Amino acid sequence: MSLHRILARVLGRKETPIAPLPEAEERDYSLSELSGYDGSDPSRPLLVGIRGYVYDVTRGRDFYGPGGPYGMFAGKDCTRALAKVSFDEALFTGDLEGLDADELEKLEEWIEMFEGKYPRIGRLLHSL
């Protein structure tokens, strides 16, 4: 039993139910479809595209949701922006052309982080 439940019983308060996070459908997404998962609709999951894959970052809503430090990445292919460690919206693309070895290494570090933290739920169709 969680500490919250114990305290709720002892203090005679009802637990406040926690709303479940919206679940993302496991499938392939077009860039246009991905844009609908940017956090503007709280009933929908938050999705991010990176190097041809789509990740469900809903559990990181504080980071990837509206107003979060990485909120601008939600609903977009942020491959190039992550490689360049940039928030420049002009870099929200899957284009790897011209990236140097350091940028490609940085991108791999980001991908490793996403793979370890968020479920990969599909592919980004424009990158196939």
Explain the meaning of each model-derived region.
Residues 2-128:
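Histidine-anchored, small-residue-rich loop motif
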